[in-house]
Design a protein with these regions (language model features):
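Helix-to-loop junction immediately C-terminal to a conserved catalytic motif
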Residues: 77
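Short loop immediately C-terminal to the Walker-B catalytic DE motif
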Residues: 188-189
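Catalytic Walker B motif of ABC-type/P-loop ATPase nucleotide-binding domains
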Residues: 182-185
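H-loop/switch region of ABC-family ATPase nucleotide-binding domains
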Residues: 217-218
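Conserved ABC transporter NBD signature motif
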Residues: 85-98
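Conserved ABC ATPase signature
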Residues: 157-161
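Conserved ABC ATPase "signature" region
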Residues: 135-153
Length: 241
């Protein structure tokens, strides 16, 4: 997949460099990035980015390692403060309506808990001092497990699952918080072809049901079959040099 292919995918969408107001009027923006710079210490990974994420997008973020893709997701999720510029939440979107699935870590893979406990942990901090989860939380957890095809695994030990099953459980956990926007960071990394296809179909189904999806991926060709827009960080990373 080259830059020309990506440009064709975005032909009718707003440019990363100069968003066009006439095009944005046809869309409802969920968030707007204006002159956004993100990074760590003295190193800027995202520079002066102007970009809108619109309601209903399936936005695929591509780019080489170190180009700022994960940094951008962390900024949207509220886990990284901009060095300059702003990330504006629009159309009534709040942080607690954003679900975030980071790249899986060794600790996550070996966590000794049941699938149901893992998914319910998305609500920690939302049930105040009660020693149990509310019925609404349990109902939402079961709904998200059904959407990710993990409901039959509810009582299973998480660390005994296959890689694909674990990732679908973590997707269910992220989905519990994702009322309107779902952020996915390399959700199929390390999965076998069958598990990868299953994950993509689940994500596409969530998008078809109205979820706005922003996904970082290296699997560009496959992801673009479903993506409605593409943000190429190989291009953005050059900006400002």
């Amino acid at each position: 997949m080259n830059s020309e292919d990506i440009q064709k995918k975005n032909l009718s969408q707003n440019s990363q460099r100069e968003p066009q107001a006439t095009e944005l009027t046809a869309h409802t923006s969920l968030l707007k990035c204006r002159q956004l710079t993100l990074g760590y210490g003295s190193k800027d990974l995202v520079r002066d980015l102007d970009y809108d994420v619109n309601a209903g997008d399936y936005l695929c973020i591509v780019g080489r390692n170190g180009s700022g893709k994960t940094t951008f997701l962390r900024g949207i999720a509220g886990l990284l403060k901009p060095k300059s510029g702003v990330i504006e939440l629009c159309d009534g979107l709040s942080r607690n309506q954003i679900g975030y699935l980071p790249q899986m870590t060794i600790v996550q893979k070996d966590f000794p808990a049941s699938v149901e406990e893992i998914v319910l942990s998305a609500f920690q901090g939302k049930h105040r001092l009660l020693p149990f989860y509310r019925k609404a939380h349990r109902d939402r957890a079961m709904e998200c497990m059904a959407l990710t095809r993990t409901e039959s695994l509810a009582k299973s030990c998480f660390r005994e699952l296959s890689g694909g099953q674990k990732q679908r459980v973590l997707l269910a956990r992220a989905l519990c918080a994702a009322e309107r926007l779902l952020l996915l960071d390399e959700p199929v990394t390390g999965l076998d072809p069958e598990s990868t296809e299953t994950m993509y179909r689940i994500i596409e189904n969530l998008h078809q049901q109205g979820m706005t999806v922003v996904m970082v991926t290296h699997d560009v060709d496959t992801a673009l079959d479903d993506a409605t827009r593409v943000l190429d960080f190989n291009t953005i990373s050059v900006k400002g040099k």
